UniProtKB/Swiss-Prot annotation:
Ranges annotated as spanning the membrane: 813-833
Stated name of the protein: Protocadherin-11 X-linked
UniProt organism field: Pongo pygmaeus (Bornean orangutan)
One Pfam family matching this protein: Cadherin_2
CDD domains (UniProt xref): Cadherin_repeat (cd11304)
Glycosylation, residue list: 27, 48, 54, 344, 553, 773
Organism lineage string: Eukaryota, Metazoa, Chordata, Craniata, Vertebrata
InterPro entries per UniProt: Cadherin-like_dom, Cadherin-like_sf, Cadherin_CS, Cadherin_N, Protocadherin
Amino acid sequence: MDLLSGTYIFAVLLACVVFHSGAQEKNYTIREEMPENVLIGDLLKDLNLSLIPNKSLTTAMQFKLVYKTGDVPLTRIEEDTGEIFTTGARIDREKLCAGIPRDEHCFYEVEVAILPDEIFRLVKIRFLIEDINDNAPLFPATVINISIPENSAINSKYTLPAAVDPDVGINGVQNYELIKSQNIFGLDVIETPEGDKMPQLIVQKELDREEKDTYVMKVKVEDGGFPQRSSTAILQVSVTDTNDNHPVFKETEIEVSIPENAPVGTSVTQLHATDADIGENAKIHFSFSNLVSNIARRLFHLNATTGLITIKEPLDREETPNHKLLVLASDGGLMPARAMVLVNVTDVNDNVPSIDIRYIVNPINDTVVLSENIPLNTKIALITVTDKDADHNGRVTCFTDHEIPFRLRPVFSNQFLLETAAYLDYESTKEYAIKLLAADAGKPPLNQSAMLFIKVKDENDNAPVFTQSFVTVSIPENNSPGIQLTKVSATDADSGPNAEINYLLGPDAPPEFSLDRRTGMLTVVKKLDREKEDKYLFTILAKDNGVPPLTSNVTVFVSIIDQNDNSPVFTHNEYNFYVPENLPRHGTVGLITVTDPDYGDNSAVTLSILDENDDFTIDSQTGVIRPNISFDREKQESYTFYVKAEDGGRVSRSSSAKVTINVVDVNDNKPVFIVPPSNYSYELVLPSTNPGTVVFQVIAVDNDTGMNAEVRYSIVGGNTRDLFAIDQETGNITLMEKCDVTDLGLHRVLVKANDLGQPDSLFSVVIVNLFVNESVTNATLINELVRKSIEAPVTPNTEIADVSSPTSDYVKILVAAVAGTVTVVVVIFITAVVRCRQAPHLKAAQKNKQNSEWATPNPENRQMIMMKKKKKKKKHSPKNLLLNFVTIEETKADDVDSDGNRITLDLPIDLEEQTMGKYNWVTTPTTFKPDSPDLARHYKSASPQPAFQIQPETPLNSKHHIIQELPLDNTFVACDSISKRSSSSSDPYSVSDCGYPVTTFEVPVSVHTRPPMKEVVRSCTPMKESTTMEIWIHPQPQRKSEGKGAGKSQRRVTFHLPEGSQESSSDGGLGEHDAGSLTSTSHGLPLGYPQEEYFDRATPSNRTEGDGNSDPESTFIPGLKKAAEITVQPTVEEASDNCTQECLIYGHSDACWMPASLDHSSSSQAQASALCHSPPLSQASTQHHSPPVTQTIALCHSPPVTQTIALCHSPPPIQVSALHHSPPLVQATALRHSPPSAQASALCYSPPLAQAAAISHSSPLPQVIALHRSQAQSSVSLQQGWVQGAEGLCSVDQGVQGSATSQFYTMSERLHPSDDSIKVIPLTTFTPRQQARPSRGDSPIMEEHPL
């Protein structure tokens, strides 16, 4: 039961809320022509008003239809039930909505007021009137006449007048039918853009006016209603003569606007139509179509001849806002032209607003009587204002003329409710005459007024009135109870019992006060405390004895005066502040908050720091603490002091609190790497390392604390193809993939260490150099790589000094070797033939060479030469190949001219592709000034030693030998002699760094001299024989020195560097051979050439003495036992013919001695590269070195004499010197043995690949030499006694089978750091002549890989 009652109450409240929300609308649908007393709807149910119980209302619910006096309503409503019924008035849609377009709905609206005021609502009810088929379609005339020319084509169509049906929709015209057409004509129905159906007559057979000139039939029209209605008309077709051109309107659709107050006769529009015919057939007749409404025909006139449309009667937009005029233009034919004229009648403010007053409160003699105590918002009447104008002209506002306690509240468009806006007072105003004004927004505006009268009924509505509206009283705290404060009084305008007043304390009065009921005296009954309550605000009531009684109130404000009875109170007994250590001096540390319950000066607190602490200050008023010092958490982490608070009372009170300031760490330290210690350290990573192995660990520390000291690691650059990964917490660098040959070399990994500090994280970076190789044997070289790599920018996935392995370049080397060898053999053969025929032209060619240009790179641009693997194998042309021929010959003791066992080492190498970096002569700046001399053409020496004077040993008329006087020092440093553009500048302008660490190595060279023995080197004086220099190197059985006589066992090493490209530095000779200029030599020449066709040059075109051209006069070294035979050709007269004045200042240039450049194919015929040592070795001075070291010296030879070098060893440390050359020559490999080892060099053969066999017994320095045997017939013989204690000599059964992974360079520590970069030695295969271990009399033969 409770649940049901609760639901009912909720529904009632919901209904009240709905009704309280404002006006409502309700829509109903009715059909036209409905009979009387038909139930339309029930508002009580439709608006859910049945949920409101009648017992909660003051009066019963009523429904009142609000309509204008004089109107005949189409509906009525039952006042008690809210049911809506039809009345006896006819509901005719066509009449009610005559002015509404046919395609719009027809509505009828009424308003219903729901009473009483508790639930008052004004409901607007809209009735949608549905059309019924109560009208039949009718033709405009019962007889329709139409003319058709006799030559009309079959299926020609002629428009017939359309029928009109006042009904709409399906009840309108739907179909046309032709009756008794005799199959001559047919009928078609088309729909116009306006939605009207137009009948068209179709000619189905040929017409002949002479045979029959008139056809009579019937046309029937039907609607779609139920029941269906129809009508017929007689159609008379007249066959006329031919008129084959129809009129054509210039514009078929015209829209015009005309104001509704336009006078009669005003032109609306001018129609223009043309006809291509002539004569009578071209005369156009204008007429309205029968579809034009009668109203339009009444208002507009169409001139049949000119087509001018004018106003026939005054227009009224309120009656019809627009008109559609369908105009036909006919030339007498059956196909008139059609044009639609849309006339929009614009509004003119010509209608005065109307005011319609519909009373909700029943008036008495047109006067509404209201009680003065009626509630606010009491609805009095519904005011409706209308204006027939449109837009702003029809926008009406309604208002009253002066201030009254009533207002107009809009509920619908142009409808207002008159209701009370204030309480009525009979004593002030007893009657109201309200003037209502309605005005539109036109220019000028039109207005209308109406009067409404209201009388006020008197009631007991006066309450007592206090003489003071606000009472203020003050009293000190700690008072005595019973003190009287004040007296209040009030008056009442009423009389009698209604004027008798009683005083009462209001419900908000505190218990500390009491009030006398009759006198109004206010008294304090308790002791007051201002700290508990500093003021009291309450009301005092004055109540009369009326029925019902009326009351009024006055507000009393009691203020408590403060006394200093409280000490200052800190918000905390102890304050702890946390400040960052980087807080600036005098920054804000914190705020001390102190309260004092007292008021005024008693609560004015002053703060100070006790104990005279000068480290901090405190604002005495705000309590802000600021430091006078700079914090450093590492020195002191906290500070403690006391703060005193003292109030400003007459007798002051104080208190104190402890303050502790804690210094908090800030992220002011970057992580610092301790491992690796610097960017120059490196770590070895073996290529065989398994993926997932930790290859290195970086360690960084942060001096901060907490999260500011937490370090995270990441790789931010230099990680080639993600080969490495790093653990962000431990710093362990892990190898992610298996290393292949492409990964060998130095990897520069950029590691970033950042802390987790907030708000900004700090970081540091370090370069971790990871060297991927089998071992670290040349630390100096790696350090140099690392040093130079620091100068290169670090980009993502950067690999520094990529080391190409023999395995990855094996195919490339083989292709280069085959192509180079075959090409050089063919070119040398052709060149040998051609050069024999070109001797007369060489002089002119030499002069042309003087005009060659020399380029000089900037020595300041030191760049790390990056050796990167080629993505594609280039086709090696002969000009990119250089063949190094090394002939090591052993002369029989009994026959110095014997050609016995010889081994020729043919060393093909593509230095441009595999070894030497290309120098960019376009982008590299030079140090030349525009007006400076060409220092590249001179070789000025800064050495204090005098230049050598070469004494010729052959006649001066020899045209194959040119000797230049060169200084002792190396004043020329070049990048490489076989690159595309070899540097040929002097030292101050030369390239400062020509090293290629990844592909070269070098060995220090020192000469061990002894006191004079039996053999000395003969001085270089003119003689018929070759000049010979003998150098004693290690003890041998005493033999008589016989020069080149029998019984003298010696080892000859001859180096020949035939020119392989246009960039080669060696000269190809000067022309045909002169027999008289040659010295006697007994050994075979390289590539099997005849002696007379092989030419050498004493000084290559781009070399100086420092590059290996030792002066022949420096060959006198006294006290040498063994000798290296050096044949020096005499100089020629042309040596100084071309010298200029600049030569006296800057030194001799190439123009003094260099011949003109020859054809590259022919110049490769007989090139010989001079193998020279640095200045100390090329001079004639005697140098004494430590006994264990025995070196072999490579000295320059002058062409065409083949030079020989005797290779000897000292007893305990069997060491072989490096055939070392200063740049840009390609240096020979070093055959080195560590001192404790008395082992010989091992010449090992690796069958699988043409790899270089390691010729070394020093484990930390595994040098590799790669040698190829030439395809020519030359050979080199190795004496078994060449090395003593040859325990390590490898035979076939002891060959190194695993040499496929050997490198033909080393990365270990450089043995000679002061020298320039180490040069490349090409690959060579050593093969024994026999399968067995060679005996003492046999020597292994070094053969080229059989490609």
